[in-house]
């Protein structure tokens, strides 16, 4: 039995848009019966230009010099992801 599903986003994340809400809308269209118990992002990896600033669950994060940010699986429930300015990013997430 699968322990989760992956989703991805590549493109420009619009400033002020909650990307987790956007991911949920996409997942609802694809896996609605599976998501009857709720949508929780348990892992996320983001790559983009170094210095891109975003909030994750209300906490400010700045992409480091590598341009890569990643959480460990199941360490936190990711409820919101909002970029301060529009930024071209690649996001891989597990829910």
Where are these regions (language model features)?
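C-terminal interaction-tip segments
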Residues: 1-31, 84-95
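Compositionally biased, low-complexity repeat tracts
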Residues: 3, 7, 12, 34, ...
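Short, surface-exposed beta-strand/strand-loop-strand elements in extracellular ectodomains
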Residues: 47-62, 90-94
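Beta-rich globular "head" domains
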Residues: 20-53
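Non-cytosolic beta-sheet module surface loops
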Residues: 45-48, 82-86
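Beta-sandwich interaction modules
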Residues: 28-37, 61-79, 92-95
């Amino acid at each position: 039995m699968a322990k989760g599903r992956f989703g991805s986003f590549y493109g420009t994340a619009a400033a002020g848009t909650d990307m987790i809400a956007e991911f949920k809308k996409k997942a609802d269209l694809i896996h609605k019966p599976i998501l009857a118990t709720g949508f929780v992002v348990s892992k996320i990896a983001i790559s983009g230009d170094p210095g891109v600033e975003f909030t994750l669950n209300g906490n400010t994060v700045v992409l480091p010099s590598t341009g890569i940010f990643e959480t460990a699986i199941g360490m936190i429930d990711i409820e919101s992801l909002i970029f301060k300015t529009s930024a071209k990013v690649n996001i891989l997430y597990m829910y």
